Amino acid sequence: MPTYPETRLTRALREGEFPVIVSLARHDLDLATAAIGAGAFAIKIHLNAYHRATGTTFGSFGEERPFLERLATLGVPLLVMVGQETVPSPQELDVLADLGFEGFNIYFTDMQPHLLQSRLRPIPALGEASTDEDLQRILDIPGAMMEASVASFADYGKPLDETDLARYRTITDKAGIPVIAPSQKKFVPDDVQRLRAAGIAAPLLGVIVTGTTPESMRAAVTPIVAAARRWR
């Protein structure tokens, strides 16, 4: 099993800095630069996936590589959702690491063994139907962090509520490792302290929050980053 370096992002996650991570609605450098300009700490992209919240299909590593190479020049931590049934090959994972990607994300139920041999830190996601046994299996992966992607699709875009926060708290109490919360619910600046209080290490802001344009990205991310900095 590989060992993973401590990075700016992993330190921020472990030390309570609440770094704001942005998941791009589409592979568009203008969106990425808008997110970074608004204060995003890290950027996440998708491969081999149909993204339900946007209706966007993300291509294979080979298809998306030109964009990934441009993205890698922006100088921020990078994460990749590697796919579902189809994921990058070991050789492609090596290239992603060489480009500067430091972690990969996938639903735990879609995990493939060769992913855990790569140089990318595993960040498996719990889903709506995940169990305590699934959580424990993630904890058994050396060096893993976790994503809590546990809202139902029917609830996407609704305000964050106490039921969501209670589930996050249950997960973070059991996990003992950094847990990232994706914005399946519509996170707003006032949610920052609530998420922190539930033990969440970082928010992952996706299209439900950011919209699909550079303008909407800046408008959404800037106040959430400001709120995160106020509560450090």
What name fits each language-model region?
Residues 49-58, 135-169:
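Glycine/Thr-rich beta-alpha phosphate-binding loop at enzyme active sites
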Residues 1-76, 139, 219-220:
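Conserved N-terminal beta1-alpha1 strand-loop-helix module at the mouth
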Residues 12-31, 78-88, 121-130, 179-189, ...:
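Active-site mouth loops of central-metabolism enzymes
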Residues 42-53, 99-114, 145-156, 196-220:
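Glycine-rich phosphate-binding active-site loops on the catalytic face of alpha/beta enzymes
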Residues 57-58, 160-161, 209-232:
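C-terminal helical cap(s) of enzyme catalytic domains, especially alpha/beta-barrels
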Residues 29-35, 87-98, 129-141, 185-203:
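Catalytic cores of alpha/beta
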Residues 6-8, 51-99, 105-117:
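N-terminal active-site wall of soluble small-molecule enzyme domains
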Residues 150-203:
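Active-site/ligand-binding-proximal alpha/beta "capping" segment
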